C-alpha cells in the first residue's frame, strides 16, 4: 500500500532511486539532519515528501504521487571523476522534447550548493549542467541535483550533507531565463547564476541543433514563463547567434549576453 493521499497543498516530491548510492547518501543526511516523519512508504516534512523508489526516475512517465514539483536526488557520472555538485533540468533537445523547468528551484539549489562548498571547504566543482536525459513527460517541473563523478564521490559524506542542506534551503526569486550556448558543464552560465539574479532553467548548449523551435519550446516549458534568454555569446557561432536574436525578437523576450548580465548586476 502506498502513502496516504496528501492533504492541503501538493508536496514537493524528492525522489531517491534505491539503487543509486548518491541518492541513498543524500537521503541518509536528510533523515539525520531534519525531522522527517514516516508517512506510508515515504517520509514527510512540511511541504516536502521524500520517496525512495524502485524505478529509475529517468524512465518515469507519470508521477508516483501527486506533487507540485519533483526534485531527483541523483548520482552524476563522468570519466573525469572530478568531484562535482551539479543541478540541471531534464530534456532531450535532440528530439525537441523538454521537461517542465522551474528556474527558481535551479537557482536556489545552485547557490545553496556553492555556499555549502565554501563553508565546508569542499573540493567540488559546483555547476549548472545543460539540459539532458529524461524524464520529459511529467506534468510538473523536474530538477536533478547530483553528486559526481565516481563511486567514491557518490558516497562521500560531506557531499551528501551539502546536497541535503541545499534541498532544504528557502526558495529564492530571480528573473526566469532560458540559457543558450556554451559547453555541457556551463561555467559562464553558472557564474551568472551565482553573481546575478538570472535564474536559468533549461540550458541549450552549443553542441545541440539550436533552432528557433527548440528555443521556443524551452521558453514554453518554463513554469511562469521565461523573461529573458541568457546567451553565452563566446560559445555560439554566427549562425546560432542569429537564430537566438531572431527568436527572441519573434517571441518578444529580452536577450542578454552573460557579459551584459554581469555588468548590469541583474
Specify the residue positions occupied by each region the protein language model found.
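N-terminal catalytic or cofactor-binding beta/alpha core of small enzyme domains
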Residues: 1-138, 150-151, 157-164, 168-189, ...
Amino acid at each position: 500500500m502506498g502513502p496516504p493521499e496528501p492533504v492541503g497543498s501538493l508536496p514537493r516530491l524528492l525522489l531517491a532511486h534505491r539503487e543509486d548510492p548518491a541518492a541513498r547518501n543524500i537521503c541518509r543526511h536528510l533523515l539525520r539532519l531534519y525531522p522527517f516523519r514516516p508517512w506510508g512508504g515515504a517520509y514527510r516534512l512540511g511541504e516536502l515528501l521524500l520517496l525512495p523508489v524502485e524505478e529509475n526516475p529517468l524512465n518515469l512517465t507519470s508521477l508516483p504521487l501527486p506533487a507540485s514539483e519533483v526534485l531527483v536526488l541523483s548520482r552524476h557520472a563522468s570519466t573525469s571523476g572530478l568531484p562535482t555538485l551539479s543541478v540541471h533540468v531534464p530534456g532531450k533537445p535532440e528530439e525537441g522534447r523538454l521537461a517542465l523547468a522551474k528556474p527558481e528551484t535551479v537557482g536556489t539549489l545552485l547557490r545553496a550548493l556553492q555556499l555549502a562548498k565554501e563553508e565546508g571547504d569542499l573540493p567540488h566543482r559546483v555547476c549548472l549542467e545543460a539540459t539532458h536525459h529524461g524524464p520529459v513527460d511529467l506534468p510538473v517541473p523536474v530538477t536533478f541535483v547530483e553528486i559526481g563523478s565516481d563511486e567514491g564521490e557518490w558516497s562521500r559524506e560531506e557531499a551528501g550533507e551539502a546536497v541535503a542542506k541545499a534541498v532544504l534551503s528557502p526558495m529564492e526569486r530571480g528573473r526566469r531565463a532560458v540559457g543558450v550556448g556554451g559547453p555541457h558543464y556551463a561555467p559562464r552560465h553558472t557564474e551568472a547564476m551565482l553573481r546575478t539574479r538570472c535564474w536559468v532553467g533549461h540550458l541549450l548548449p552549443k553542441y545541440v541543433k539550436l533552432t528557433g523551435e527548440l528555443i521556443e519550446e524551452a521558453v514554453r516549458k518554463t513554469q511562469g514563463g521565461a523573461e529573458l534568454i541568457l546567451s553565452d555569446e563566446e560559445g555560439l557561432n554566427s549562425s546560432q547567434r542569429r537564430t537566438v536574436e531572431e527568436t527572441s525578437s519573434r517571441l518578444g523576450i529580452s536577450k542578454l549576453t552573460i557579459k551584459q548580465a554581469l555588468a548590469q548586476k541583474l
